[in-house]
Each structure stands twice: as C-alpha cells, then as structure tokens.
Amino acid sequence: MTCREKILSNDYADLITDYVVAEELSGTSPIDFCFHGIDDGYGVANVRRSMFPPMSIGYYGYSAIPVLYGLMQTGEIVFDPENLAQTGSIRVQNPPLSLQGAGVVLGFIDTGIRYELDVFRREDGSSRIMALWDQTIQDGEPPDGFLYGTEYTRAQIDRALQTEEPTLLVPSADTNGHGTQMASVAAGSILDQGLTFRGAAPQTDIAVVKLKPAKQYLRDYYLVADGVPAYQENDVMEAVRYL
C-alpha cells in the first residue's frame, strides 16, 4: 500500500509522535508503517493495527492517540443584520474606518464550503476563495508537501464557476453545511447593499480545508455514535500547517 492509502485506511492507526519514535519504528522489522512530519518536532505515523495492541492510553500514551472533534452547532442559520450590528462590525465597515478585510486571508478548517454561492464571490462573479484543500477527494493532486486529498486553486474554481455545472470541474461540496455557514458569517460578501447578506469581513480572501471524517476505529474507541460528525486531531494539525 502507498502512504496515501495507509493514511486513509481503517486498517492503519494514526499516531501523533516525534521523530525519535519514527526512527525506532524504521529500525524495527517488519513494522508496516508510514511517517510524515507536521512540524520540526512532531508528525504522524500510520501503523498497521493488526501488528499492535488495541488503542489504550496505557500502551500508546495520551498524546499519541488523536483526539476527535465534533461540530458546535448544526442546522440552518437565518441571516439577521441586527446580530451583525450588535457586534460592531457594520460600524467599522463603514467610513471613516472602512475596515472590510482587504489584504487579509481568513482560513477555515471545517466541513467544506459551497464555493459557488454568491457570498463567496466578488462583484464580477470571480471567487474570493484562493485555495481549497479537500481531504476527502483522492483522485486529484494534494497540496505540495502533503500526501492525501486534492487541492483546488482559485483559477480552477473560477473556471468551474463559468460553467453551468461547476461541481463537474471542482467536485468539492459541503454536504453538512456547517463550514459554509461559518465562512459566510465571518467572510460573506455584501449582497444587495447588506440587505440580503453581509459577513463580518466581506473583502477578505478565503482559504478552506475540508476535513476527512474520522476513521471508524477511533470512533469506536471514543464511543462516537453513528451519524455524528467527527474529525481527527492529526487531520486538523495538517490543515493548520496547510493554512
């Protein structure tokens, strides 16, 4: 199996570890694993589960087993400009400050984004999304320095938006809706002079990581119920490195 396949396979456990442990694994035959670094101190080892004991803090240590993260809020959010006004955002967006996020990049690590929506476009219809890394799509090229998922550039997204069916060219989708809602609240464009929609920073560029779902063995370990979204700590760490 390739390292990409091991990263994705439920037959391989993901362990957050340092380079010393990775070197020890390399010197142990016949351990079946891959290791890829996240920063100067830590990385992720993907080891065949059948060659190691079941998940336990006693054996692996607390920090090695990825924590799982869920969503704080689900369901449709109705736009209400009064809520935005209470934060003070509209006041600083208007003169004399005119602070709308120009020159800033906002990054979102979540369930993805519905990139085709008007709230993520400029007035000319082009995308405000400068990069989108979808960890769940494996038939494209991952970002430079990463081993899984597919990266879509602004140019690719803009080409897709010029077609009748954008998802044929950029098939990334936010089926949950949580990531789209968070990005729109923070960075949604001003539509109809703010009557239809207005985000807190409507002129920022946007970068997005769509997290892949947690592996089943970790869901079982943490007793996460079926159907409840859950995402792995190491995938979040990779997303932070990307952004």
Residue ranges and their predicted role:
Residues 1-105, 111-128:
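Autoinhibitory propeptides
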Residues 236-243:
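Structured alpha-helical segments in the cores of large, soluble enzyme domains
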Residues 94-235:
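Subtilisin-like serine protease catalytic core
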